[in-house]
Amino acid sequence: MAQLLRSFINQSCESLAEKEKSVKHGSIVHTKICGTREFGKDCRSSRIIRCNARSHFSRNAGEFNLSGRKLTNMLQSSILFFLLAVPPEKPFAITVVDDRTNRGVPMIELRTVHGIRLFTDSNGIVAFREPGLMSETVFFHVSGHGYEHAKDGFGFRGKQLKIEPGAAATIKVTRINIAERLYRVTGGGIYRDSLLVGTKVPLAEPALNGQVIGSDSVMNAVYRGKIYWFWGDTNRPGYPLGNYNVPGATSELPEKGGLSPELGVNYSYFVDEKGFARKTCEMPGKGPTWVETLVTLKDKDGRERLLAEFVKVEAPLKIYARGLAVFNDEKQQFEKLFDLDVSAPCVPRGHAVRHKDADGDYVYFAHPYPLTRVPATAEAFGDPSQYECYTCLKAGTKLENQSIDRDAEGKIRYSWKKNTPAVGPPEQAKLIAAGKMKAAESPINLRDRDSDKAVTAHGGSVYWNEFRKRWVMIAVEHYGKSSLLGEVWYAEAESLVGPWRQAVKIVTHEKYSFYNPKQNPMFDREGGRFIYLEGTYTNTFSGNPDATPRYDYNQMMYRLDLSDPRLVIPKK
């Protein structure tokens, strides 16, 4: 098309030049600029142009002159405008789907032979539009965390596609992960390529919401009929420094008008006057504010309150202040209740889960093991003296004392104690190294079900699952095989405090982090058969300098089918 128009411009210019030379002074000519570009016909009823001695055309009633050269320029400009107004070639739509579910797979990389890299959006779509290749056959290498394409005869994992503007093709990949990657939850361009090819998308704001292009670890809770979401450090497009004081948002519950969790989450961000997700928990002191616990509890008057534990952080990731806060519904931000002693042995940290048993009604805080609890009232949450830790230390002692609580027969005793620190994996490792206890004596002795290799759980959550009739833990491994903080595990126990014995790997990210994973129990489907979990996908701590465009430093949602036979953990 472009070449044809350029040829036409050149021919028109040459014709105009010749006609201008042939027009005699004082003659009447008709210039008809139309599809046939007829020139020089006498016509009294049409537009009349008279040639003067200087070979200028002047309209009978006009007040300005146009030379043949100027008319040529006008014609060139008009056609150039038309050329520029022609829409660009439509992109070629490539959809990468899971070969078992036929659902589009996000974050699959397509790489050409000469290194053009493209990543599927949350519909599994890439909009390919590359000048020079729009009518060629192109080979794409196909790769993505937890998924793979079959090898061809030469060992290449990829596929040849005949590119045609506006056409489409599908590439199938096999899922290696047990968990299924669904979509990116935060950031910009979640459905970028879908928009470019005209595919329907589920989100109200599929390209940019709250000016958020990156968000760290999530905390959420159901409060007054909605889901409240809060994140750590958050990036914006306008400047490298973003929001370091807890941006937040709300969304509707799926059963109350919200999206089905298999489709996405429509966030309504709390925004500032510029439209950027604003601070909701800015506490005094230098450095960022992070929320480490979020829970909904009723006070003595029966009023539901949204409560949080926060920390202040300075380099290098040192917590120098800690406190409790309550959400102000009118201001839509947290207000400090009071400070906590940074060195206090029992503080709420981690994702909250409520449980009532013979001991009473408590809120437990899992990080990832639920080793701290407090009575399930707003007043108790705000009283540091009410917190208890699950520990094998003697009451009132510190870890450095290494005083193990044992019965008369020397058997180690774990129990809930006040003013005594919990013994989680890091503390347990120190006691084992000091010869004070053995790993088998602890309720926390998590190992790979298949290899019996020890699994060090770093961050995660624990919730009751009605489908499995057990407590289910989702946790990321510290010092995993493929990445420092990128391998996610599934474990279950009959008791909230364990014993936690066997785990199954459900997600792998090759040399990439996926830290602070969290199950979202409000999204459970089919009685808990399907659970939904998300985490922070980032190259931070991974040693990998290659950050995935748009996806890096954002939350990614996965779905896990608990009826999958690969998840069976024998009861012991």
PLM-predicted stretches and their roles:
Residues L80-F92:
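Beta-strand-rich domain onsets/edges
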Residues L133-Q160:
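A short, solvent-exposed loop/turn motif at the edges and junctions
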Residues M1, L16-S22, G26-I33, I49, ...:
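Short terminal hydrophobic/aromatic SLiMs and anchors at protein ends
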Residues G166, V173-I213, V222-G287, T296-C346, ...:
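Beta-rich carbohydrate-recognition and catalytic domains
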Residues G115-E130:
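Short, acidic Ser/Thr/Gly-rich low-complexity loop/linker segments typical of extracellular
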Residues K90-F92, R100-H114:
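Short, ordered, surface-exposed loop/turn motifs in non-cytosolic proteins
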Residues S217-M219, T293, H351-V353, G459-S461, ...:
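Conserved beta-strand position repeated once per blade in WD40 beta-propeller domains
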